């Protein structure tokens, strides 16, 4: 393990002792929000401390076994036993080292959150809209595999199938590392290019078209309050498309415009105007915050060009080549020849590879910061 990681872990142990003291302080106990935040931090720090203690214990076992081996020159049985313990300890240490590195990667608080996924058809006309429908199915089937909940917020179907635009909300529990839907899918943001022979193509020529995907974290309920109601224009209209006649009899669809930025969000899927307004407000808030995040990411990118990129939807991140059965993620040079399986929702290999690549980036950044730049 690199020295800077061990120093970071030592600081984590000190922080755990601080948290023990803070959580028993009367002023903290009486402040519910602070108490909850510190309790969550304590739980995460405890997991790290437990793993670190296991690591140091196995390192001690390794040192002891190596001493035993050095002293067992004339005792083959003892030497064999020592070698077995050395091999077992080294295996455990490598696994614990890797797990601790993942735990030390700085956490984005938004990774725990639900996500809005916006899929928009781009260049390629009808074929692009059909591919937007394919991406919609990919993400919904991936969500089904994870037992996540999927909700359509708004949709604009195309005439030949697929979507001109569709917005989903996906929610589900966090994993053991505290990563939720947004943390899993955040790296899907960007330009997705498809190469295939359209069903309407009689000459068998391969066409290229594209869609854009934006993945936004659902904002905290308290954040939405910070938007000035005077800055909003709220319009109601009759829903079209999905929803049926029952919705079309009333002006239940809602469109909200944030006047200072011109950002618009709408929802027409619910049966009540109140419910649609609440969902549209969540999407609007997420888009406003994403604009702020993108501006900050652009500033950061000017100083450091990350491998994964800023998540800007103009970045071409991936190519889906159907004739070759190939998916290529250009950010990390990942190529998989199981495109049809992936399009049925088997996205885990892609998601994991992107998370590992980003984790390696963050560890390098952490090391640079610890070394004083």
Curated annotation (Swiss-Prot):
Gene3D superfamilies: 3.30.160.20, 3.30.70.1660, 6.10.140.1950. It is found in: Cytoplasm. Methylated by PrmC. Methylation increases the termination efficiency of RF1. SUPFAM superfamilies: Release factor. One of its GO terms (cellular component) is cytoplasm. The lineage of its organism: Bacteria, Pseudomonadati, Pseudomonadota, Betaproteobacteria, Burkholderiales. Keywords: Cytoplasm, Methylation, Protein biosynthesis. It comes from Polaromonas naphthalenivorans (strain CJ2). The keyword Protein biosynthesis applies. Coiled coil: none annotated. The modification N5-methylglutamine is found at residue 245. The keyword Manganese does not apply. Belongs to the prokaryotic/mitochondrial release factor family. GO terms for molecular function: translation release factor activity, codon specific. PANTHER family: LD18447P (PTHR43804:SF7). Pfam families: PCRF, RF-1. It comes from the Bacteria. This is Peptide chain release factor 1. Peptide chain release factor 1 directs the termination of translation in response to the peptide chain termination codons UAG and UAA.
């Amino acid at each position: 393990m690199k020295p800077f990681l061990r120093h970071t872990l030592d600081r984590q142990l000190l922080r755990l002792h601080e948290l023990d003291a803070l959580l028993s302080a009367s002023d903290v106990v009486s402040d519910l929000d602070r108490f909850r935040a510190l309790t969550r931090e304590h739980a995460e720090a405890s997991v790290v401390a437990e793993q670190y203690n296991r690591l140091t214990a196995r390192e001690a076992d390794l040192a002891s076994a190596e001493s035993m081996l050095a002293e067992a020159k004339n005792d083959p049985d003892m030497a064999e036993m020592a070698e077995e313990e050395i091999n077992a300890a080294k295996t455990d240490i490598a696994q614990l080292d890797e797990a601790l590195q993942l735990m030390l990667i700085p956490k984005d608080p938004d990774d725990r959150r639900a996500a809005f996924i916006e899929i928009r058809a781009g260049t390629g006309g009808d074929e692009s809209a059909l591919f937007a429908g394919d991406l919609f199915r990919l993400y919904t089937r991936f969500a089904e595999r994870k037992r996540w909940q999927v909700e359509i917020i708004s949709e604009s179907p195309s005439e030949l199938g697929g979507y001109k635009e569709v917005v989903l909300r996906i929610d589900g529990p966090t994993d053991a590392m505290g990563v939720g839907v947004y943390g899993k899918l955040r790296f899907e943001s960007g330009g997705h290019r498809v190469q295939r022979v359209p069903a309407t193509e009689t000459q068998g020529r391969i066409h290229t078209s594209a869609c854009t995907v934006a993945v936004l974290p659902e904002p905290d309920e308290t954040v939405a309050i910070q938007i000035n109601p005077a800055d909003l224009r709220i319009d109601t209209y009759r829903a079209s498309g999905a929803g049926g006649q029952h919705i079309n009899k009333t002006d239940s669809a809602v469109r909200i415009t944030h006047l200072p930025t011109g950002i618009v969000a709408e929802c027409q899927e619910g049966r009540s105007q109140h419910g649609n307004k609440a969902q549209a407000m969540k999407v609007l808030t997420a888009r406003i915050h994403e604009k702020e995040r993108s501006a900050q990411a652009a500033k950061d990118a000017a100083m450091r060009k990350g491998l994964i990129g800023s998540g800007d939807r103009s970045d071409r991140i991936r190519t889906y080549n159907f004739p070759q059965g190939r998916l290529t993620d250009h950010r990390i040079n990942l190529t998989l020849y199981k495109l049809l399986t992936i399009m049925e929702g088997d996205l885990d290999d892609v998601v994991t590879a992107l998370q590992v690549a980003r984790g390696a980036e963050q560890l390098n950044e952490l090391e640079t910061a610890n070394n004083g730049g």
